[in-house]
């Protein structure tokens, strides 16, 4: 039994493109950590995977995505003002999106991370506030979702697009190495 330890509809949708049979069991783990963005993402993924594994067993995938700029981690905005400040900070600059993952398979943990660089165009206040009014940024690390309207903001990316969405292809490859069938319908 393959279990995705996430409430994210984006992670569920990406995984379903490659693997047909899996269950979704959101984690109840508390999301707090310290360290580098990479360490933080992996640690949060581990906490999620372990918490769900303790309840349901099977093969469990935990993932957590963080956006960072100047070494500072940008989580999900708590309100519109914080979303504005995050987007203003990202405007015209390169930032990093890191997804940590932890797969617990037969009691063993396989953990790692993927990082993608993203460059935003210069964003004026009118555009930032129009985007915030869509409601899209409020449940996303760094206050944006590349797969939605904020795709307009992106000048370029270097790395895995799916990582920026929250589920890097590295996870699919790890699952394949563990014997899970991918691309079957």
Swiss-Prot record:
It is an enzyme of class 3 (hydrolase). Its cofactor is a divalent metal cation. GO terms for biological process: nucleotide metabolic process. The active site is at 64 (proton acceptor). It is found in: Cytoplasm. Its EC number is 3.6.1.9. Pfam families: Maf. This is dTTP/UTP pyrophosphatase. It comes from Thermococcus gammatolerans (strain DSM 15229 / JCM 11827 / EJ3).
